[in-house]
Amino acid sequence: MKYTGSIFKRSRRLGFSLLENNKEFSKGKKRKTIPGQHGNRFRSSTMSGYAQQLQEKQRMQYMYGITDKQFRRLFRLVLKQRGNLAVNLFRVLESRLDNIVYRMGFAPTRRSARQLVNHGHVLLNDRTVDTPSIILNPGDKVRLKAKTIKIPIVKAASESGVVSPFVETNNKTFEGTYVRFPERSELPAGINESYVVEWYKRLVK
């Protein structure tokens, strides 16, 4: 509950559902405004360019559950790639192993997907791995171990049937394939990735 509470608080502060399901803003929650005495006034005020970049960076960082150090390392990787920098940044984040486990519907949140990987419940191309930050390529195969299938949150997540279009899964065997890189239209719409790019362009050389 401690982690869930912090996610709800961060989501309200950033005005964005980090869980991608708007649970943080559901009617059952006591607070729907930005935490703090002046939450509503802050939200309505005009933000500076710096503040907008910081907010978008935090939205993306907290949604994928990575540290600023990890973000900078990923950004350096993206700088070497061809194509649209902002789209490539999103694609690299989406290609992380913990995110793919989440996108395949094997875990209810990225955090729980990351824990599954950390504790050795996940096989990548038939090899047990414990590094959530591994970057996958299209064609890579992910599978959960037999004992993992019995974990309640794994069963519940799989039964929800929420699977992204750029992966293929088999809910009976709990295995899936990363079919292709996602299109921008298939990714979270509430983030302006161009602000994130501008933020890290100043910091990463």
Curated annotation (Swiss-Prot):
GO cellular component, one term: small ribosomal subunit
Example of a GO biological process term: translation
S4 RNA-binding domain ranges (all copies): 95-156
Function: One of the primary rRNA binding proteins, it binds directly to 16S rRNA where it nucleates assembly of the body of the 30S subunit.
CDD domains in the cross-refs: S4
NCBIfam families noted in UniProt: PRK05327.1, rpsD_bact
Record-stated family: Belongs to the universal ribosomal protein uS4 family.
InterPro entries: Ribosomal_uS4, Ribosomal_uS4_bac-type, Ribosomal_uS4_CS, Ribosomal_uS4_N, S4_RNA-bd, S4_RNA-bd_sf
Protein name: Small ribosomal subunit protein uS4
MF terms (GO), sorted A to Z: rRNA binding; structural constituent of ribosome
Keyword line: Ribonucleoprotein, Ribosomal protein, RNA-binding, rRNA-binding
One Pfam family cited in the UniProt record for this chain: S4
